Every structure is written in structure tokens, then in C-alpha cells.
Regions:
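Pore- or pathway-lining transmembrane helices of multi-pass membrane proteins that form conduits
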Residues: 11-16, 159-178
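Juxtamembrane non-transmembrane "cap" segments at the membrane-aqueous interface
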Residues: 174-200
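Aromatic- and glycine-rich beta-strand/loop motifs that create alpha-glucan
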Residues: 1-14
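Alpha-helix N-cap/helix-start motif at helix boundaries, enriched for small hydrophobics
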Residues: 87-90, 237
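Short cytoplasmic-facing helical segments at TM-TM junctions of multi-pass membrane proteins
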Residues: 75-79
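Alpha-helical transmembrane segments of multi-pass membrane transporters/translocases
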Residues: 203-243
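Secretory targeting signals
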Residues: 22-66, 90-159, 178, 196-201, ...
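Short helix-to-coil transition segments within interhelical loops
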Residues: 80-85
Length: 243
């Protein structure tokens, strides 16, 4: 049963990771390379689909179940009774989610970026600006995965309904509220990723200019959020009453 659940998660992650690539290839093959299609590629596919949707969902699937086996088997007590610092227990769990999520999503974002958009465009013009854009997408996605992983690993220890919590958080806070209230972007993982994306290549991602926070604020915000939720996870593990 557990192997089936793991296989289902991996299949879901693979499908979600392939979705931007497939859509990007379709758009690149059917639409003309003009400013309008470039804006649509950035706002709809990169932001709306990858960064706002697929990135948090994939990371949620991985991170909320970081301690799932131990909680299900009631073996978490064996972990916490070991004479090792709690952060050394949390860190490998967090890193596992980050590594798997980053590989899938960075490849997805990079290939989609090479295939779609005008100046971001085809592989044949990879040296004409699109390499920088691809690297920017990779870094922005990585930052998003790391930050979300810290939040959702903590959620997996705090509540047995971590996935429900994560979905509400992603679609309400990251999706709806941050889209209408500009100040919320300073407390939004999506806002951090978009600001880093634009900050690393403001020419290719110029359509984002009016709705991103400052690049330094995004870097600091992502780092602080990751550190805070890592600390909260360690603290939660230390205080848990495990059977």
C-alpha cells in the first residue's frame, strides 16, 4: 500500500512537471513570436501555471509527508530519542524534498523557457538572451521549492491535515490575496520567486516589472522564511508528545 502511494506521488509529480513543457511546445508551435505572446507566456505559463500552481503543489506533496512514515508507523519516538540534535533529524527530511522537487521543477521550467516565449524563444537562439532567462527561471524555482519545503515540512508535523492546510494556504494566500493586495507579496513565496526571476533578468521578464517586489527584499524574505520555518519544525519535533 505504501509503495503504491509512493508510486502515485511520483507519477503525479512527473505529470505536473511535464505539463509546462507540453504547453510551452504547443504554444511555440502554434503562436507567432511577438510581444503579446511573450507576455502571455510569462504571465500565464511561467507565473500562473508553474510558479503559482505546479511548484507549490509538487513541493506540498513531497514535504508534507516528510515524516509521514514515522508518524504512520508510530516510530517517530525512535528518532527523537536518538542522542542527536533535532535539526540533524529535520535537515535530511527537508533536503530530500528539496532535491526531488528541485530536479523535477527546474528541468520543467528550464525546458519550458527554452521552448516558449519570443526573445526567451527557441533553442536555436539560446545564446541570444534565453540562456540568462533559463538560469533565472531555475534559480527562482529553486528558491520557491526551498521556501515551500520548509513551510510544508513544518505543517506535516503540526497537523494531520497538512495537505488541506497547504492547499488553502497556496490558493488563498499565495494565489488570491497576494494578487489583489500588493503588500502581501512581501510575505509571499510566489512573490519572492517572481521578484528573483525578474531581478536576475529584467529584460526578458519585463512584463513582471509592475507587480514584483524589490530583488533584495525577495532574497531576504525567502531566506528568513526558510530559516524561521526550519526552526519551527525543529522546535515542534522537540516538543511533540510522541507515542
Amino acid at each position: 500500500m505504501r509503495q503504491l502511494a509512493i508510486r502515485s506521488k511520483l507519477i503525479l509529480i512527473l505529470i505536473l512537471a511535464l505539463l509546462p513543457i507540453g504547453l510551452s511546445a504547443l504554444v511555440s508551435a502554434t503562436l507567432s513570436e511577438d510581444a503579446a505572446s511573450n507576455h502571455g507566456f510569462i504571465n500565464t505559463l511561467l507565473d500562473g501555471l508553474l510558479i503559482a500552481g505546479i511548484l507549490p503543489i509538487v513541493t506540498m506533496v513531497l514535504a508534507t509527508s516528510s515524516f509521514g512514515n514515522e508518524l504512520e508507523d508510530r516510530t517517530l519516538s525512535y528518532l527523537v530519542l536518538k542522542p542527536v540534535p533535532r535539526w540533524l533529524i529535520v535537515l535530511p527530511k527537508l533536503m530530500a524534498s528539496i532535491v526531488v522537487g528541485s530536479i523535477a521543477l527546474i528541468v520543467s521550467g528550464a525546458v519550458a523557457t527554452l521552448l516558449g516565449g519570443s526573445s526567451i524563444g527557441a533553442v536555436l537562439v539560446v545564446l541570444d538572451g534565453s540562456l540568462q532567462a533559463t538560469l533565472a527561471v531555475g534559480v527562482a524555482v529553486f528558491v520557491g521549492v526551498v521556501t515551500y519545503a520548509a513551510i510544508f515540512t513544518w505543517a506535516g508535523l503540526v497537523t494531520s491535515r497538512a495537505i488541506a492546510f497547504a492547499l488553502i494556504y497556496v490558493f488563498l494566500w499565495e494565489g488570491l490575496i497576494s494578487s489583489f493586495l500588493g503588500g502581501v507579496r512581501y510575505l509571499s513565496v510566489r512573490g519572492y520567486s517572481l521578484a528573483i526571476l525578474h531581478g536576475l533578468d529584467d529584460t526578458s521578464f519585463e512584463p513582471l516589472r509592475e507587480r514584483v517586489i524589490e530583488f533584495p527584499a525577495a532574497v531576504v524574505g525567502a531566506a528568513v522564511t526558510t530559516a524561521v520555518f526550519f526552526w519551527l519544525t525543529v522546535r515542534r519535533l522537540r516538543q511533540m508528545d510522541v507515542p
